[in-house]
């Protein structure tokens, strides 16, 4: 029942009027912390687009099952578990800090990021939308191609410091509830693999 309630609450959120911050995160080499984070300032246009993508991925979820080792996800389903079963609270603590105190200082702060998340505050609720990035998320990898942008009917250079992000989110964390839309990426980001002891 908790899974269905969590999905219904997620689907009912007013994302359009939410306060948004954007964070990139990397794995930490420290023994005490699993992640390092940097915040980035999103233009109003980017904020609107990120909310639109989040809404699109939330709306496609019409079914939910409890997370398990053998559970699968189809194009209209997601899996449910509680965040305290994972290391997500460590990432959550970092992105709960004021974004302006953790702004990126150089492009290298973004290069090699494991993922990015948007943090949306809607009244008393906080929603984290998390996406794993590819291993090639580096500006220097695109030294032999041109980044172009289409503006009206004109093609122009987008500049050398362009990044590409997927139009998806791999999991959503609403307060303490996690709803997973990509099991592999979720497990990779949070180093999560639920195991079972089988008694004979």
Predicted regions and their residues:
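Charged, amphipathic alpha-helical stretches
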Residues: 2-50
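Acidic, low-complexity, intrinsically disordered interaction modules
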Residues: 29-199
């Amino acid at each position: 029942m908790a899974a269905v309630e969590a999905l219904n609450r997620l689907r009912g959120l007013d994302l359009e009027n939410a306060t948004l911050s954007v964070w990139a995160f990397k794995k930490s080499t420290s023994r005490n912390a699993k992640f390092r984070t940097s915040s980035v300032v999103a233009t109003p246009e980017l904020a609107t687009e990120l909310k639109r993508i989040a809404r699109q991925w939330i709306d496609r979820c019409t079914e939910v099952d409890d997370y398990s080792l053998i559970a699968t996800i189809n194009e209209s389903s997601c899996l449910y578990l509680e965040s305290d079963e994972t290391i997500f609270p460590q990432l959550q603590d970092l992105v709960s800090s004021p974004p302006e105190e953790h702004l990126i200082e150089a492009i290298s702060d973004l290069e090699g990021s494991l993922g990015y998340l948007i943090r949306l505050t809607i009244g008393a609720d906080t929603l984290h939308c998390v996406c794993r990035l590819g291993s090639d998320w580096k500006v220097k990898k695109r030294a032999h191609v041109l980044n172009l942008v289409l503006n009206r009917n004109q093609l122009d250079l987008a500049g050398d410091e362009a990044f590409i992000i997927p139009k998806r989110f791999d999991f959503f964390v609403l307060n303490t509830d996690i709803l997973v839309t990509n099991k592999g990426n979720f497990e990779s980001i949070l180093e999560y693999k639920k195991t079972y002891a089988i008694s004979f």
